[in-house]
Amino acid sequence: MKRWLLAAACGVVALGLLLYPLVGELLSEKYHSDIEISYTAAIEDTDDAELTAQRQAAQQYNAMLANATISEGGASAPPLAYAEQLTVGGAMCYVDIPKINVYLPVQHGTGAETLEKSVGHVVGTSLPVGGESTHAVLSAHSGMASSKLFSDIDQLEKVDTF
């Protein structure tokens, strides 16, 4: 009887280990889908004047960042508060890389909680709104069992767009 219980317990543990990556990826996709729905609804519910104001504030932030001095620790912080930029819908934007089937939300910062579930925007780099002399730096994990994120980024080439 004890051997049977031990064998069953080992089987359950083995099954759990085998299913963990699949279940983790499904939960991650559900999380990203929920954020996309929320983000899209928030954008649609926000009037054009507010969206324009958010974009202009982000462009002003980028302009100040372009003129900031660089020290050993990175760019000096511009006067506008980073966390107040691009705040509609809980995500800053989305990164879309069709070649590797990636469409992920971009969150403020690169803390552990952010990078566990999504792409993080590196503080001190341009906000992802485009423009001259702007270079937004994004960060995400690759090779995680619980989420794909940037796992296939090594398949990209210099000519690929995103």
What do these predicted ranges mean?
Residues W4, C10-T161:
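Solvent-exposed, non-transmembrane regions of membrane-associated and secreted proteins
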